[in-house]
């Protein structure tokens, strides 16, 4: 995500979303059939597993399963490689989804800026392909 942050500081910051804030566009904008992501692990399950706040994400149910396996087969730390793989893969897919959402937000902000610019040009009396007289000289 570093490349996105560099674009925010070096490029036009108005079309780069802030990664620390929630998206400004609704998640079903352009996708009327899109379902909302839901947590599989409940709050009570995460409390029982004593997960810290950073671990309470959409992959918490895989982490709970992995920690339980580690506890049950303690001396044999290699017995839980499948659970570890499932958790890592879920974290990877979650990261990819968040990057896609970030890119979607960036493109929607660019689209919004282009539309506002087009409306401002039309209000000035400039049609598509026309330039202002001071620019033409």
Curated annotation (Swiss-Prot):
Residue positions where Phosphoserine is found in the record: 73
Predominant location category: mitochondrion
Keywords from the named record: Disulfide bond, Electron transport, Lipoprotein, Membrane, Mitochondrion, Mitochondrion inner membrane, Myristate, Phosphoprotein, Respiratory chain, Transport
Residue ranges of the motif Cx9C motif 1: 59-69
Record has Membrane as a keyword: yes
Classification via InterPro entries: NDUB7
Domain of life: Eukaryota
Region (Disordered) residue spans: 110-137
Motif window: Cx9C motif 2: 80-90
Annotated ranges, domain CHCH: 56-98
Lipid addition sites, N-myristoyl glycine: 2
Disulfide bridge map: 59-90, 69-80
Membrane-related topology note: Peripheral membrane protein
A molecular function GO annotation: NADH dehydrogenase (ubiquinone) activity
GO cellular component, one term: mitochondrial inner membrane
Cellular localization per UniProt: Mitochondrion inner membrane; Mitochondrion intermembrane space
Subunit and interaction comment: Complex I is composed of 45 different subunits.
Family: Belongs to the complex I NDUFB7 subunit family.
Purpose: Accessory subunit of the mitochondrial membrane respiratory chain NADH dehydrogenase (Complex I), that is believed not to be involved in catalysis. Complex I functions in the transfer of electrons from NADH to the respiratory chain. The immediate electron acceptor for the enzyme is believed to be ubiquinone.
Domain notes: Contains two C-X9-C motifs that are predicted to form a helix-coil-helix structure, permitting the formation of intramolecular disulfide bonds.
Protein name in the entry: NADH dehydrogenase [ubiquinone] 1 beta subcomplex subunit 7
Organism annotation: Bos taurus
């Amino acid at each position: 995500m570093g490349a996105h942050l560099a674009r925010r500081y070096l490029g036009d910051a108005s079309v780069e979303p802030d990664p620390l804030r929630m998206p400004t566009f609704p998640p079903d904008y352009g996708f009327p059939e899109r379902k909302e992501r839901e947590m599989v692990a409940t709050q009570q399950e995460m409390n029982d597993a004593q997960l810290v706040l950073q671990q309470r994400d959409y992959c918490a149910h895989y982490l709970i399963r992995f920690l339980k396996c580690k506890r049950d087969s303690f001396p044999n730390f290699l017995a839980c490689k499948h659970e570890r793989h499932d958790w890592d893969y879920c974290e990877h897919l979650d990261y990819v989804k968040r990057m896609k959402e970030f890119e979607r937000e960036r493109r929607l902000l660019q689209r919004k800026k282009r539309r506002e610019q087009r409306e401002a040009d039309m209000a000035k009396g400039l049609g598509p392909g026309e330039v202002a007289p001071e620019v033409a000289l």
